[in-house]
A protein has these predicted regions:
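PLD/PLD-like phosphodiesterase catalytic module centered on the HKD motif
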Residues: 2-44, 48-199
């Protein structure tokens, strides 16, 4: 019989967030079976993130791309992805997958916290989505083996999922020269190269 690991709250430094989350999720998936293919309810990673630039979104995306996370990911984002941000297309495609993802439209729901649910007993809860996780240290709850905590997190996720809107289709398209318009003023610069005589 395995020893239960109680949930614990830790203050995580800004620069350590992504690495600590990646290690936490990898440990659950690889060592403790944090996500079970045999359990229909646990056959998805449930993710709530402020944006695709949040450390939790980047951590999950990296583990999907490397093949550590092989089950579907259901994602709720508070902020629409900025298509010009570096790596946003790769992160979005990894964390949205076949579920399409949802977007928070009611700003009152920004009081919800970032979180992950893996299987029936593992979860993580971060700061509320009003605060940018890339600007501050934060208290975070790591629950690697607590079905009660994971159950509460799962219920919160499902309720939020049901009242959020699907991500717009255009956000799910790869960013290319055709889909991403040039910055303001670029058209004028091309039409009138530097050094052109003024009329």
């Amino acid at each position: 019989m395995s020893r239960k690991v109680a949930p614990f709250i830790d203050i995580v430094r800004l620069e350590d967030k992504e690495a600590k989350l990646t290690a936490f999720i990898r440990t659950l998936v690889e060592q403790t079976g944090g996500v079970s293919d045999a359990d229909p309810k646990g056959n998805a990673v449930l993710l709530i993130a402020r944006s695709t630039e949040s450390p939790v979104a980047k951590a999950v995306a990296a583990l999907v791309r490397e093949g550590t996370i092989r089950v579907p990911v259901k994602t709720i984002l508070a902020l629409a992805p900025r298509q010009e941000a570096e790596g946003v297309s790769e992160t979005l495609s990894a964390i949205v997958g076949t579920h399409g993802g949802r977007l928070v439209r009611d700003v009152r729901l920004f009081d919800a916290h970032e979180q992950i649910v893996l299987g029936q007993a593992a979860s993580w809860t971060g700061d509320c989505m009003r605060r940018d996780p890339m600007k501050r240290d934060a208290f975070e709850c790591f629950a690697g083996d607590c079905s009660k905590t994971a159950g509460w997190a799962r219920t919160s996720f499902e309720r939020l999922w049901n009242i959020c809107e699907p991500l717009p289709e255009d956000l799910l398209q790869p960013v290319t020269a055709e889909t991403c318009p040039p910055p303001v003023g670029v058209e004028d610069a091309v039409a009138e190269p530097l050094g052109s005589p003024q009329v």
